[in-house]
Amino acid sequence: MGECIFCRIADGKIPAAKVYEDDSTISFLDIMPANKGHCLVVPKKHYETLLDIPDEDLKNLITVTKKVVKALSLSIGNGSYNLVMNNGKEAGQLVAHAHIHIIPRFKSDRLRIKWSHKKYTDKEMKDVQEKIKKFV
C-alpha cells in the first residue's frame, strides 16, 4: 500500500518517534496526541481493520500494546490509560490501516471519552443477543 502513511512509516520512508519495533509491529508517538505519551501500535503489514488481521498477528499486536502500556506507565504515566481502536469510517477511523491508540490518562487532563447511554427494552436485548450468538 504505497500511499498508506502507516505503511510508509513501517518501511522507514517517513520518520516517526518510534518507541518500539519488531519484525511485525511498530509503535510510535501520535503526531496529534490526545495526551502526553499518546502512542499508536501498528502492524507492519497492511490490514484495514481488526477483522482483517490474522490471529497470530493480532496476538503480537496485543502483546506489543501491553509492552508499550507498561513502558508508558513506568516512564511518564500512573498506570491509567485508554485503549482505542477505531474500525471503519463511522467509528472515526481516519487512516485505513488497523492501529491501536494508547492514551495515558492523568488526574487533571480533562480528556473525556463519553457517549450518550441508550437503553434496551427486554425484547430488544434478547433479539440483539440472539442475532450476535448466531455468528459467534
Where are the regions that the model predicts?
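HIT superfamily nucleotide-processing domains
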Residues: 1-136
